[in-house]
Amino acid sequence: MTPMSGDIWLADIGAETRRSVYVISDDRFHRLAERAIVAPLLPAGEPGRTPPWWITHDDPVIALERLSSIPVDRLLERHGAAQHTTTRAVQRAVGWLTGAHR
């Protein structure tokens, strides 16, 4: 199965650690680089105290300050996809973090 932007996957992030991640990069990037840009899903903190670079996805948050690139073959199992509104929020936040919103 090919990972798509907005998917949630269980990933091998090294040191025998597995974590749910949100896939940010698209399938074209995956084919060309054989890597995926991902952000970990973390437990939500105290309500109303989440930084703007954390995007809420159900109970966990997508922690955009922890972006990383991993080989596509370390994406082990697809767990679903984020809602369109979540994907748009991630795209906007990444744009602000990288200055691409200008």
What do these predicted regions represent?
Residues 12, 17-55:
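Compact nucleic-acid interaction/catalytic patches
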Residues 1, 55-102:
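C-terminal terminal-subdomain/extension
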